[in-house]
Amino acid sequence: MSFSFRELTRDDAAQIASWRYEEPYSLYDAADAERFLAFEYFGATDEEGQLVGYCCFGEDARVSGLEEEPGVLDVGAGLRPDLTGIGLGGPFLREVCRLGKDLHDPIRIRVTIASFNRRAQLVASALGFEQEGAHETPEREYVLMGRMV
């Protein structure tokens, strides 16, 4: 599958807000479409133009309480629930990082992954991300992973 990116539309945001992930990934469910429109989100489409994922960068991708670091681009991304766990995470994250690099020209890229989400950590690791630390919010713990661009 190849991915194309576009600015997120209102219809895209409504679709994403309707996506439901199986446990324990339900924390990625997003009930509020307006949240996506208030920030700079991008929709990812497949070859047929179907919405298959989304991504965001910088402040929009940064977990609450995590400080901005000069030269570091925070990246957030999500695949449609029916496309998770089937080997698309690596190619998707690779293309998201390429888009982030093209738009923001960072020195490093950082992803913040819920500590229980071993699947996403393995995807990031396979793309050269290394664990750099941890971050904790009142709701959960996260693993910080980064790589040079």
Predicted regions and their residues:
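Conserved beta-strand-loop-alpha-helix junction that forms the acyl-donor binding cleft
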Residues: 110-121, 138-139
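Extreme N-terminal starter segment of soluble prokaryotic enzymes
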Residues: 1-3
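Solvent-exposed beta-strand sheet faces enriched in polar/charged residues
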Residues: 58, 110-112, 132
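Acetyl-CoA-dependent GNAT
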Residues: 7, 14, 18-82, 99, ...
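Conserved acetyl-CoA-binding loop-helix of GNAT-fold acetyltransferases
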Residues: 85-99, 122-126
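Conserved acetyl-CoA-binding loop of GNAT-fold acetyltransferases
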Residues: 125-135
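Conserved beta-strand segments that form the floor/walls of ligand-binding pockets within enzyme
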Residues: 74-78, 110-112, 144
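Short hydrophobic/aromatic beta-strand or adjacent loop that forms the aromatic wall/cage
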Residues: 39-41, 139-144
